[in-house]
Amino acid sequence: MLFLKPNSSLSGPNDPVTIPRGALKTDWEVELGVVIGSKASYVSQADALSYVAGYVLVNDVSERAFQLERGGQWDKGKAADTFTPVGPWLVTADEVADPQQLSLWLEVNGKRVQDGTTANLIFGIAELVSYISGFMTLHPGDIISTGTPAGVGLGQKPEPWYLKAGDVMRLGIAGLGEQSQTCVAAA
């Protein structure tokens, strides 16, 4: 599953996340972001990592009702303003020994809800860069989010639960830093 997020969805690592008007199921997703360092088109898997500038922490915030219901579309549910907090910094590729061996976690209001590792990614980083570059040119600064471990709100048991104004998300990836976002209602 691939989708694009607009620049307007980008925000800083500790900026508030705005829950859009009409949102009912705003959800969290801690993810490893792969930052492209040089133009990549039709790149082989063997060469793919040489096009990576580095790695960042990403919170792929999602509005599940917009995404999956009401004639939902992935872009609509993923693209709201502030729905892609990135940072706190870019760690260059040479400083990450193995990007497929990083622990990542996310807490909501102090409760650990996601605790995983990039070793469990469905698709490896080289495979993602190669695959995507086969149908769209990747440019320096493009970010590929690699997917999230179990524990999103949609998957909570016994019942799903979602973010509301006042909730605080805190998340991190080993060696890439931490983020903290407070959820606010759209004005």
Walk through the language-model features, giving the residues of each.
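Hydrophobic beta-sheet segments that form the core/acyl-binding groove
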Residues: 15-22, 30-32, 36-40, 106, ...
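Short, basic and Ser/Thr-rich N-terminal targeting/leader segments
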Residues: 4, 13, 26-30, 51, ...
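Extended, compositionally biased flexible segments
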Residues: 1-21
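Short, structured patches in soluble enzyme cores that scaffold and shape functional sites
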Residues: 5-7, 28-38, 56-61, 90, ...
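Short Gly/aromatic-enriched secondary-structure transition segments
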Residues: 45-56
